[in-house]
């Protein structure tokens, strides 16, 4: 299962780097929870798909160049759910060039029919926009 989960997040990485919003949406349940430093929200996939292009554009304009999968730790909760801690390596462009920064998120995945995985809960452990902004003045 660990290899399957790693493949899932490599697919997530590819979807995140492409302009094909629907491929990002394919990885999420129809309704999911999103948590971050400001709290937790229930999100409908259709609403999420409307926001993704604006979010990508905003982060790109701030200097986000690339997001790459770094680490994946999988912990089965039961036969249907997996807790996954993921490390991302993000590349941020600032006035002195590009800098790599680590970001972390925890996901709860649901294992559906045919072992298909979907994100039902995502917790970002930092506000990505704040992380990118903090790198703009770093040399």
Where are the model-predicted features located?
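Short, cysteine-centered beta-strand-loop-beta hairpins and adjacent loop/turn segments enriched
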Residues: 90-100
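Hydrophobic alpha-helical core bundles mediating ligand binding, dimerization, or RNAP-core interactions
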Residues: 9-12, 16, 28, 48-55, ...
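Short, low-complexity N-terminal intrinsically disordered segments enriched in polar/charged residues
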Residues: 1-30, 135-139
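A solvent-exposed, acidic/Ser-Thr-rich amphipathic alpha-helical stretch
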Residues: 2, 21-74, 80
């Amino acid at each position: 299962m660990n290899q399957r989960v790693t493949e899932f997040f490599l697919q997530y990485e590819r979807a995140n780097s492409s302009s094909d919003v629907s491929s990002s949406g394919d990885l999420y349940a129809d309704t999911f929870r999103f948590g971050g430093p400001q709290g937790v929200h229930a999100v409908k996939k259709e609403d999420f798909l409307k926001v993704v292009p604006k979010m990508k554009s905003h982060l790109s304009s701030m200097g986000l160049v690339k997001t790459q999968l770094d680490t994946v730790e999988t912990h089965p909760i039961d036969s249907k759910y997996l807790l996954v801690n993921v490390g991302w390596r993000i590349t941020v462009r600032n006035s002195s060039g590009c800098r790599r920064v680590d970001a972390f998120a925890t996901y709860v995945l649901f294992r559906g029919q045919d072992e298909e995985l979907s994100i039902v809960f995502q917790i970002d452990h930092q506000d990505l926009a704040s992380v990118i902004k903090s790198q703009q003045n770093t040399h």
